[in-house]
């Protein structure tokens, strides 16, 4: 069973701020309506039969599910409530509680009715917007704002109200592009002025005094936006019958929970590509999000991870091959976009990226990568021994960074090519024991999960026996135990580092070590909160596609689910992710937190009793740590950006805001530089990749571990009798 946090690359959610493309001429093109093929009704009936039977909720396809499906479909097309009119929704609402009955009867026409109406309204909106862009008449002195978060905004009641929204939207996008270019030039000038005179002379000498070649004329913001909206409408008005069916049946499936979905035959190919870790030549797992390719996971060892500038949660909106032109990939089918990103080993590709920290979409980075194979050794666990001084005492401490729960499922340990993260970690633990390491930091930050078997085996390195996790499906509750006679590989104190990106198998391990009193959890307030298992099931003939259904839930051995709640930190050391609007609880129709009876287990230690004292010592220490105070300022600044609901449309106010935001986003690209490097108790800088210059959270984790070792007085977990065979 695989518990990796995989996000199915399915849909293109409509109408994202600052992105798209259309021309006024295209708006006058003849409209084409789409209708279902004759056998699509049978697919709908099959889905209506499977969801109540196999989904963990065991909920019938009823009026409640119908209402959720209605909302899913309407908001899939009109994500920011800017295309449909209120009267359109009132007309569609007549069938809001009837979709369950229609699909059971083999009627899937509602999905096509919504799509065709959406296309008609979209043409009207973009025709207006592109005419406005062509006139290029803006008043950037007026005291206006643009609402950037519109998921809860009311739909416009009239066409005039809709056009007022689109006027502000175009003004916002033009202003954002204009000021972004202006700030780029100012930054370039500052850097040039700051260079030593010798460098400037050397550069001039290399130029040989020749006249610079004329630069290629850039598009104006208006020209750039017209091109984007042209592509937006082209893509959104070209879906075939199968794609529209996928959108509709997917909306019905996701009414049960966000990880349940319908996959057309073409979409199933994308899913298989993701599950087989087809990494697009740059080392990333991708999904569709508001029309862009969202970075779900940066794979260790890949070009993207080695470069370090692209983060999980960033969005790819453009691709350039070698020295060619940048091609917009917004709203394109995922398969087409991936084909552009992939390529021969050693070739160059430039990605245009929207940083995760900018909800306005105004900031774009162009990052060149060289395509390469993913090096398996770079995906593996890494470890080292750190010498940490605290209070005049220097200790040897072990550190293991585990990027994912990898493991070979179809080979024996003696077979060539066998891989196991638990086995790799055990080798590091043996090394730590041999050099006398007194404790361990297990770093699960950014670990999205993987093999459940490996999660159990990893826990077995620290705990002698008992259940690791409970699993509840539609029929039974069971648990996965550590095999009897298991020898503990590491018996000394452990702290586990987690963040909001730690999910699934990571949450199982962190929760188990916390529940058994074997480790103290540090990091973001809580982890991601994905506590469910999905199964992919065929629906009959290949042309019917497949469905991905949530069939079980995970529970900690204390009886609490990891769903939504995740694993809470014993000591809160926030990362920048802690300030962003991410996590299972942010997904529509997420299954709620629940609990069952605790498993039969005994604590292996009681490290939790030291949490209050450790937390007080850490707080006192960090209060006087200038580096950490700066880190917290950045976290709070990022939180303010992510919670922003509107932006000014006056030039001066917007420029001040964008300049301040830039300073914070630069700190999301690389960790903060040390501010008090003369502190002789601060652990040495330890880069986790080529670009990471500092990790204040990891530094404090080592200090907390050092305090914990002092408090336990050298105590270790007793070694059980017997051997794990």
Q: For each predicted feature, which ranges?
A:
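Bacterial N-terminal signal peptides
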Residues: 9-21
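Bacterial N-terminal signal peptides that target proteins for export
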Residues: 1-11
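Extended, small/polar residue-biased N-terminal targeting/export presequences
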Residues: 61-67, 74-150, 233-288, 348-350, ...
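PDZ/PDZ-like domain segments forming the peptide/carboxylate-binding groove
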Residues: 75-76, 97, 111, 116, ...
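Cleft-lining beta-strand/loop regions that shape enzyme active-site pockets
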Residues: 27-31, 35-36, 49-62, 234-243, ...
């Amino acid at each position: 069973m695989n518990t990796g946090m995989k996000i199915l690359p399915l849909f293109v959610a409509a109408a994202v701020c600052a992105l798209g493309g259309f021309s006024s001429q295209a708006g006058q093109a003849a409209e084409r309506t789409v209708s279902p093929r004759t056998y699509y009704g049978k697919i709908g009936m099959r889905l209506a039969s499977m969801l109540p039977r196999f989904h963990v909720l065991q909920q019938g396809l009823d009026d409640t599910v119908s209402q959720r499906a209605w909302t899913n479909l309407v908001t899939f097309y009109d994500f920011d409530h800017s295309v449909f009119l209120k009267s359109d929704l009132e007309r569609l609402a007549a069938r809001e509680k009837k979709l369950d009955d229609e699909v059971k009867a083999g009627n899937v026409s509602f999905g096509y009715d919504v799509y065709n109406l959406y296309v008609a309204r979209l043409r009207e909106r973009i025709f207006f917007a592109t005419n406005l862009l062509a006139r290029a008449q803006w008043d950037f002195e007026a005291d206006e704002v643009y609402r950037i978060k519109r998921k809860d905004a009311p739909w416009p009641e009239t066409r005039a109200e809709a056009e007022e929204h689109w006027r502000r939207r175009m003004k916002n996008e033009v202003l954002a592009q204009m000021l972004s270019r202006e700030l780029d030039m100012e930054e370039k000038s500052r850097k040039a002025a700051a260079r030593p005179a010798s460098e400037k002379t050397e550069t001039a000498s290399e130029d040989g005094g020749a006249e610079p070649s004329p630069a290629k004329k850039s598009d104006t913001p208006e020209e750039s936006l017209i091109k984007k909206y042209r592509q937006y409408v082209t893509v959104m008005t070209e879906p075939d019958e199968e794609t529209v069916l996928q959108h509709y049946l997917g909306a019905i499936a996701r009414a049960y929970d966000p990880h349940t979905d319908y996959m057309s035959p073409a979409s199933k190919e994308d899913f298989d590509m993701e599950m087989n870790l087809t990494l697009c030549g740059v080392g990333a797992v991708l999904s569709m999000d508001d029309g862009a390719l969202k970075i779900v996971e940066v794979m260790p060892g890949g070009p993207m991870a080695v470069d370090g500038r692209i983060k999980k949660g960033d969005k790819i909106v453009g691709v350039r091959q070698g020295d060619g032109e940048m091609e917009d990939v917004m709203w394109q089918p995922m398969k087409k976009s991936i084909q552009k990103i992939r390529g021969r080993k050693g070739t160059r590709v430039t990605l245009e990226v929207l940083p995760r920290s900018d909800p306005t979409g105004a900031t774009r980075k162009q990052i060149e990568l060289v395509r390469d194979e993913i090096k398996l050794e770079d995906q593996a666990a890494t470890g080292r021994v750190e010498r940490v001084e605290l209070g005049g005492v220097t200790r040897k401490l072990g550190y293991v960074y585990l990027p994912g729960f990898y493991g070979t499922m179809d080979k024996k340990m003696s077979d060539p090519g066998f891989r196991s993260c638990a086995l790799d970690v055990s080798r590091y633990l043996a090394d730590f024991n041999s050099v006398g390491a007194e404790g361990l930091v297990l770093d699960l930050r950014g670990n999205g999960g993987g093999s459940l078997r490996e999660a159990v085996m990893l826990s077995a390195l620290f705990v002698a026996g008992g259940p690791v996790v409970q699993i509840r499906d539609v029929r039974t509750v069971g648990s996965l135990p550590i095999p009897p006679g298991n020898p503990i590989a590491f018996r000394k104190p452990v702290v586990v580092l987690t963040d909001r990106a730690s999910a699934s198998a990571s949450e199982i391990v962190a929760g188990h070590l916390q529940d058994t009193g074997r480790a103290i959890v540090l990091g973001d307030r809580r982890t991601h909160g994905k506590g469910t298992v999905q199964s992919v099931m065929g629906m009959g003939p290949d042309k019917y596609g497949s469905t991905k259904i949530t069939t079980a839930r995970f529970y900690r051995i204390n009886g609490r689910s990891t769903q939504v709640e995740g694993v809470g930190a014993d000591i809160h050391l926030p990362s920048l992710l802690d300030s962003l609007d991410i996590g299972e609880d942010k997904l529509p129709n997420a299954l709620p937190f629940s609990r069952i009876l605790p498993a039969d287990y005994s604590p292996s230690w009681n490290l939790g009793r030291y949490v209050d004292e450790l937390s007080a010592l850490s707080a006192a220490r960090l209060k006087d740590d200038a580096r950490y105070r700066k880190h917290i300022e950045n976290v709070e600044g990022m939180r303010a950006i992510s919670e922003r609901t509107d932006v000014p449309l006056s030039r001066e106010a917007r420029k001040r805001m964008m300049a301040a935001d830039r300073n914070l986003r630069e700190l999301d690209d690389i960790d903060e530089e040390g501010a008090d490097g003369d502190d002789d108790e601060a652990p040495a800088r330890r880069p986790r990749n080529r670009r990471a210059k500092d990790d204040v959270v990891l530094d404090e984790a080592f200090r907390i571990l050092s305090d914990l070792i002092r408090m336990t007085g050298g105590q270790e977990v007793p070694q059980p009798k017997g051997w794990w065979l």
